[in-house]
Amino acid sequence: MSTQSVSSHNIESSSFSANQHAAEPSVATGGIISEIVYNADQPIVTHLLLPLLQQLGTQSRWLLWLSPQQRLSRPWVQQSGLPLDKMVQLHHINPLFTVDAMERALLTGNYSAVLCWLPHELTEEEKVRLRHAAQAGNTYGFIMRPESAGDDAYRLFPSLKIHSTLYH
């Protein structure tokens, strides 16, 4: 894995094991899934999420970006202060299998955070699967979903769902 570029990575061929991270201190225990519904014209989400990702980047584990539609910009990653040598991106995946890929990644325990861009809401069954996988892998999972016209009927304002065991 080169420290000079954002790397592609095969989830199933990772050489790390979940047990390597058991003794490592973590930001949260048990893993968690949060959904961020965003408006592409409002960069506030970036400002909210970056400090957490920077903190998670100090762990020995990877940061995984599942973004089927686009690639991460290397200059943006460098400018944002995220560790290039711990960034992994999968962008050549079928959008239909993105949730399955996220579940497998969360289960491995190899990632501090898994960010996943989805064009639609998750089913209840998918939410349960991801929640269990995040807890099993002690991993943060962020589901990034763009605001759609249908969301306007239910929301007066853009929303951010932040779930934390620190506040409950």
Swiss-Prot record:
User: What are the UniProt keywords, alphabetically?
Assistant: Cell cycle, Cell division, DNA damage, Septation, SOS response
Q: Can you name the source organism?
A: Pectobacterium atrosepticum (strain SCRI 1043 / ATCC BAA-672)
A single BP term in Gene Ontology: DNA repair
The task this protein performs is described as: Component of the SOS system and an inhibitor of cell division. Accumulation of SulA causes rapid cessation of cell division and the appearance of long, non-septate filaments. In the presence of GTP, binds a polymerization-competent form of FtsZ in a 1:1 ratio, thus inhibiting FtsZ polymerization and therefore preventing it from participating in the assembly of the Z ring. This mechanism prevents the premature segregation of damaged DNA to daughter cells during cell division.
Q: Which domain of life is it from?
A: Bacteria
Gene encoding the protein: sulA
Q: What induces it?
A: By DNA damage, as part of the SOS response.
Give the family, as the similarity comment puts it.
Belongs to the SulA family.
| Record region (Lon protease binding) | 161-168
State whether it acts alone or in a complex, and with which partners, per the record: Interacts with FtsZ.
Instruction: State the HAMAP family in the record.
Output: SulA
Query: Where exactly is the site Essential for degradation by Lon protease?
Result: H168
Q: What is this protein called?
A: Cell division inhibitor SulA
Extract the ranges annotated as region (FtsZ binding).
105-111
Q: Name one Pfam family in it.
A: SulA
Modified after translation how?
Is rapidly cleaved and degraded by the Lon protease once DNA damage is repaired.
Region of interest called Disordered, as start-end residue ranges on this chain:
1-20
